[in-house]
């Protein structure tokens, strides 16, 4: 169950356990009645990356695994190449997991807040970047919707302050309010944005 409901003309409430809380003051703008506000952490799984110690060359020499930093991220685009790679030892001792797969959504949440990119290669990434995996998606429609709206949502009002505050942790990200339209509306929004972008580029 998604624990956040929006009644834009009356009030907005959130159920936390058995308690119902009025969060009308937290809602940044009105949305259509068929949409709802959701906490980011209720609709996606997030994974924060890591940086192997720079002083330990064993983690960087003979690197064969792609490692993404913010400078590698293509704003509003696809990451097709990286500047650095990490070794098998780094994978086994630091990351201890498979790389983030090609096609995944990444977002920076430190320094350059809200930059989104799609991975064009399997890769690991640093701790200023999160991998975002929707709990439910169809043909990457929700992924693409988040790809386009997160730069705006994460840099607007209280959201920006929450992410860039002194306490940077999963809680700040989990509490981001995301306007969630029905799936077909998400698809229409993505299609319209891509059409506008294509006209701007050329």
Question: Where are the model-predicted features located?
Answer:
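A generic structural signal for residues embedded in beta-strands
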Residues: 107-108
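Extended, domain-scale alpha-helical bundle/helix-rich regions
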Residues: 1-19
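Basic, amphipathic alpha-helical recognition segments used for DNA target recognition
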Residues: 40-45, 74-81, 96-102, 118-124, ...
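Non-catalytic DNA-recognition/assembly elements of restriction-modification systems
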Residues: 21-51, 180-191, 196-202
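Sequence-specific dsDNA recognition surfaces
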Residues: 20-26, 41-57, 71-102
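Short coil/turn segments at secondary-structure boundaries
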Residues: 14-15, 53-61, 82, 160-163
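Short, charged beta-turn/beta-strand-edge "cap" motif at the junction between a beta-strand
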Residues: 112-115
